[in-house]
Amino acid sequence: MEEEGSGCNVPRLPWASILRAALLLLLIGMVIYCFLCGQRFTQQQLDSTGWDLAELLLNHTESRQDPRLRWQGSPALGRSFVHGPELDNGQLRIQRTGIYRLHIQVTLTNCSSSTWTVMPRQATLTLGICSPTTHSISLLRLNFHHTCRVASQRLTPLAKGDVLCTNLTLPLLPSRNADETFFGVQLVRP
């Protein structure tokens, strides 16, 4: 037997197609939203850490009347930059309070085992906070121990306004070579 029908075709809306298109648009919108929120969160993290860091090279002057070493930082110098901290007369001034990783290496010029007989017995490199004077403290004291190079690093809390100074025993001369003499800081935790 045949079924009887009205014989009249009722136009159907393509609900399935409309529903698929709506879900696809919703999914694309959610992906774009998540991507933009992720970008904003990443940028906020970068801004909150401040990326305070510096890698400095020696600003060498021929005669050393002062034991203090002067530093310079600029991309024009090569592998040298300052982002966050500031250079103040060759010394590094901290702009944000936090825990910093300090690293330093100094190599002496014209240094060999035969020159140690005329070198000072207590040839040292000192890295410390020299300003403000109420907060002045030595952070690293490195003895050359009859070698031509010293290097060290450490984590230390620093406050906004601290000025880091490096002193080298007179009359020793540090190497100008950027691979041999450098100093840097990096904020690791605000």
Swiss-Prot record:
It is a single-pass type II membrane protein. The gene is CD70. GO terms for molecular function: receptor ligand activity; tumor necrosis factor receptor binding. Gene3D superfamilies: 2.60.120.40. Glycans are attached at residues 59, 110, 167. Residues 1-17 are cytoplasmic. It is found in: Cell membrane. It comes from the Eukaryota. Homotrimer. Expressed at the plasma membrane of B cells, it is the ligand of the CD27 receptor which is specifically expressed at the surface of T cells. The CD70-CD27 signaling pathway mediates antigen-specific T cell activation and expansion which in turn provides immune surveillance of B cells. The keyword Transferase does not apply. Keywords: Cell membrane, Disulfide bond, Glycoprotein, Membrane, Signal-anchor, Transmembrane, Transmembrane helix. The lineage of its organism: Eukaryota, Metazoa, Chordata, Craniata, Vertebrata. Disulfide bonds join 111-148, 130-165. This is CD70 antigen. Residues 52-188 form the THD domain.
